[in-house]
Amino acid sequence: MSSPTSTPSRRKSKRGRGSNPPTPRGEEVQSPPSQKRRTEDSTSIGELLPMPTSPSGDIQSPLFSSPAPSRHSAHQSELDLSSPLTYGTPSSRVEGTPRSGIRGTPARQRADLGSARKVKQVDLHSDQPAAEELVTSEQSLGQKLVIWGTDVNVAICKEKFQRFVQRFIDPLAKEEENVGLDLNEPIYMQRLEEINVVGEPFLNIDCDHLRSFDQDLYRQLVCYPQEVIPTFDMAANEIFFERYPDSILEHQIQVRPYNALKTRNMRSLNPEDIDQLITISGMVIRTSQIIPEMQESFFKCQVCAFTTRVEIDRGRIAEPSVCKHCNTTHSMALIHNRSMFSDKQMIKLQESPEDMPAGQTPHTTILYAHNDLVDKVQPGDRVNVTGIYRAVPIRVNPRVRNVKSVYKTHIDVIHYRKTDSKRLHGIDEDTEQKMFTEERVAVLKELAAKPDIYERLAAALAPSIYEHEDIKKGILLQLFGGTRKDFSHTGRGKFRAEVNILLCGDPGTSKSQLLQYVYNLVPRGQYTSGKGSSAVGLTAYVMKDPETRQLVLQTGALVLSDNGICCIDEFDKMNESTRSVLHEVMEQQTLSIAKAGIICQLNARTSVLAAANPVESQWNPKKTTIENIQLPHTLLSRFDLIFLMLDPQDETYDRRLAHHLVALYYQSEEQLKEEHLDMAVLKDYIAYARTYVNPRLGEEASQALIEAYVDMRKIGSGRGMVSAYPRQLESLIRLSEAHAKVRFSSKVETIDVEEAKRLHREALKQSATDPRTGIVDISILTTGMSATARKRKEELAQVLKKLIQSKGKTPAFKYQQLFEDLRGQSDAAITKDMFDEALHALADEDYLTVTGKTVRLL
C-alpha cells in the first residue's frame, strides 16, 4: 500500500487528471460535476483515492467507508483507537453488504464513475494551510469529513446516532416486544447491557424508532446504508466500551436496522431502489448449501517470497501485477490457505400469497446471507427481510470481460425477522426465551386452571362456523399435538406425535373454511388442492441449480410444512400416484427420495388435515365411507379421526344456522370479542403448550388406555368383527397427550383418556358404521369391507359352488346362464357385482376361471 502522504508534485499531477472546484463551507455536499476515470497507476484497490480539493486534503485521512483500514496498514486512524476492537471488518463480511463503492446513490449514477475502488471523504475545510492543524484532534478531524458522493457528515452522523441510542424512549412500546426491559428507560442502552451479559454483539435497530427521533438520519440510512451502517457500528462500539471497558466480545458490535419504512412489494422493486435499504416480506422456498467466499486474498512473490494482502471488493480480486519488493512483473501467486474466507448462502424468497395481485403468479428474488445470518431461516419460513438491493453485471462469456447491459439483481441480507401477526408464534432457539414474559406465562397458567378451558379454546377456533363442536375439538387437539417420543436408542424407533384428521361430507358444510382457518393460524402451514397437486409437488423434485448448474433437490409442500400442518382440500380428487406418497409421510413421518442419483430421506413431521367430498356429490347413507369417497382403505386407516360433516336437512337446525350467519353481519365487533377468547391469547396458549408442555403417561392413564383398547376389541369379537387395531390405540395415546397439553399438565390423567376415547368413538360412529347393520366396524376403514359384507360374500361363493357341483361334471358354463340360475335359486336380491365377487372368490381358490362370457372349471 502506498504511503498516505504524497509529495505536492504527485498530488498536482492527480489534480490535473480530474480537476474539481473546492466545496464551499456549510453547503450540502454535491458529487463532482465531472471526474475522469482513474488509471491503474493512481492507487491500488486497497488504498484511498484522494479527492481533488487541496494539497492538505489527503494527509492521514481516516477511512470512514464500509471497511476500516487494513490491519496491516502502517497508519491507523485515530478514531479506531476509541474501541479495543479494530474496525477492519468490511460490511460485506459482517452485514452481508458489499464494501462501500461509488455506484448506486443518485450522486453516483454516472458511467465515468464505475470504479469499484474505495474513495476518500471530501474535506470541507480545504483552505487550511497546514496538515498538522488538520489532525490536531479527533473531534476537529471528524467534523470536516463528508463521505464522497453523499451528504453524510461522519462526525455529525455518529453524534446523532449516539444521541439516539442514549436517549430514545419509545412511548408506544409494548411489553410483548420488549421482554425484560424497562419501558421508561432508553431501550437501546438496555440492549447494550444485554449484549454485555449475553455476549452476542448484534444491536437490532427499529427504523421506525430512528425515523421518529431524527428524520434526516433515517433518510441517510435508507439512501446510503453501506456508508451509514459502519458509522453506526463505530458509534455503538464507542458507547459500549466506554460503559463496559472490560467486556470481551467475539467481534465488534454490528448494528442491524430493520422495519424500514421503504418496505417494498417484491414485484415493485425497480432501479431507483438499487443500493438502498429496503424491507420485503415473503416465504423462503429454497436455501443453498454454505459457500465459502473470499474476503481477503493473500499473495506471495515467487521470486523473493514477499507477501501482501488484498481485500476483495464486490467479488473482484485485484492481483498485484508488480512485486513491490523486487519489482518483478507477474510473479505474485495466490495462496489459498492464507486467505480469509466467510460463509455465504443463497436463499430464494417467494412472494406471499396475500401480497399477490389478482391473476398473477408469485415473484421470487434471490437473497445472499453472510456469516452468522447463514442457516437462520429454513424453507417454509415466512420472514421480513431487511437488506440492500444490489445490481451486478452479467458477463457475455465467462472468459471475456465484456458484460451485458441488463444487470442481475439480488438482496444482501442485513436482518431477518420471522414474524406474522396472524399466525402462531414459531418458536426457535433464539426467540423462545424472549417470547413469553413472566406476566404472560402467569396469565396463560391462570387460564389453564379454569375447568372449561377445553371448551373455551374449541369455541375460539373458527367462531364463524356454526356448531361442529367435536370437529373443532379434534382440530384443536391436532394443533397441540402429542408428545414426540424417540426410542431409537433402545431399537424401537420413533413414534409420531402428529394427529391426522379427515373431514368428509356434503358440499357447503364449511370443510374448506376450516382448512383455510388452520392454514392461516399455524406458522409452517401449507395449503394445497387435490387436482392442483402432483406427487413431486407434495414431496420433492430434482432441478438444475441456476448458479452451480448441478442437480439439486427442491422440497414440496409436505416437507415445507415440517413441524406444521399440511391442509389438503379436494382429497378425493387426487391422482392415485399423488396419494401414494402420503402413506410413508402419514405414518413414518419421513420421505424417502431416490431420483437422478440423489438418494436421501427427508423429515416430514407434518400433521395432515384433509377434506373430501362424496362421489355422488351428496353423502349416501346406504354406503360405507370407502364407497362414498372412493379412497383406499390403506390411506384411511392412517387418519386418527375421520369426521362426517353432513347437512341434516332439519328445519330447526336450518333456522339456527341462518340466525348464526345473519348475526355475523349485524353484530358489532365488541359483541363478538366478548363472546370468544382473544385471538392473541389463543396463539400464545398453543405456542407455549407446544414448546414447554410434554406430558407423560401416568399409571392410571396407562391402565385406562389398556382397558379402552380391550373393550373396543371385545365389542366386535362376539360378532366376528374387528372393532380396533393397534393404530387405534396409538391414536388414543396421541389424543390423550394433546388433551393433557390443553390443561398444561405434565402428566396424562384418566380424564384425558376419557375425552380421547369419547372423541374417537364419536368419529368412528360416523365414519366406521356399517350401513346395513348400524354397528361400528373398524374393518371398513382398515380393509375396505365390513365384516357382514365379507361374510355375505363368502356365503354367496359357497352357494355358487354348490350350484356348479349340482350340475354334474360339466366343464364349462355360460356366464349369463349361471347368473340367472343363481338368482332363481336365492331368495335375496343378487346384483351382478355380488355375482362377480363370488366368482372372484372361487377363482382365488383355483376352483374356476372366467374367460370372456364363459366360466370354466379347473
From Swiss-Prot:
GO molecular-function terms, A-Z: ATP binding; ATP hydrolysis activity; chromatin binding; single-stranded DNA binding; single-stranded DNA helicase activity; zinc ion binding
GO cellular component: chromatin; CMG complex; MCM complex; nucleus
Gene3D superfamilies named in the record: 2.20.28.10, mini-chromosome maintenance (MCM) complex, chain A, domain 1, Nucleic acid-binding proteins, P-loop containing nucleotide triphosphate hydrolases
Gene Ontology biological-process annotations: cell cycle DNA replication; DNA replication; DNA strand elongation involved in DNA replication; double-strand break repair via break-induced replication; mitotic DNA replication initiation; regulation of DNA-templated DNA replication initiation
Reported modifications of this chain: Hyperphosphorylated during mitosis in a mechanism requiring cdc2-cyclin B and other kinases. Undergoes dephosphorylation after exiting mitosis, existing in a partially phosphorylated state in the cytosolic interphase mcm complex which associates with the pre-replication complexes (pre-Rcs). Complete dephosphorylation inactivates the mcm complex, preventing its binding to chromatin. Becomes actively phosphorylated during S phase once the mcm complex is assembled on the chromatin. This chromatin-associated phosphorylation occurs during the activation of the pre-Rcs and is independent of cdks.
Residues the entry annotates as binding ATP 1: R492, R638, R727, E730
Positions of the MCM domain: 453-662
Reaction catalysed by this enzyme: ATP + H2O = ADP + phosphate + H(+)
InterPro entries assigned: MCM (IPR031327), MCM_4 (IPR008047), MCM_CS (IPR018525), MCM_dom (IPR001208), MCM_lid (IPR041562), MCM_N (IPR027925), MCM_OB (IPR033762), NA-bd_OB-fold (IPR012340)
Record localization: Nucleus; Chromosome
Zinc finger map (C4-type): 301-326
E.C. designation(s): 3.6.4.12
Source organism, top-level taxon: Eukaryota
Motif stretch (Arginine finger): 637-640
Polar residues composition-biased segments: 54-68, 79-94
Keywords: ATP-binding, Cell cycle, Chromosome, DNA replication, DNA-binding, Helicase, Hydrolase, Metal-binding, Nucleotide-binding, Nucleus, Zinc, Zinc-finger
Annotated region described as Disordered, given as residue ranges: 1-125
SUPFAM superfamilies named among the record's database cross-references: Nucleic acid-binding proteins (SSF50249), P-loop containing nucleoside triphosphate hydrolases (SSF52540)
Family statement drawn from the similarity comment of this UniProt entry: Belongs to the MCM family.
Misc. comment: Early fractionation of eukaryotic MCM proteins yielded a variety of dimeric, trimeric and tetrameric complexes with unclear biological significance. Specifically a MCM467 subcomplex is shown to have in vitro helicase activity which is inhibited by the MCM2 subunit. The MCM2-7 hexamer is the proposed physiological active complex.
Protein function: Acts as a component of the MCM2-7 complex (MCM complex) which is the replicative helicase essential for 'once per cell cycle' DNA replication initiation and elongation in eukaryotic cells. Core component of CDC45-MCM-GINS (CMG) helicase, the molecular machine that unwinds template DNA during replication, and around which the replisome is built.
UniProt-recorded name of the protein: DNA replication licensing factor mcm4-A
Species this chain originates from: Xenopus laevis
Lineage of the organism: Eukaryota, Metazoa, Chordata, Craniata, Vertebrata
Gene name of this polypeptide: mcm4-a
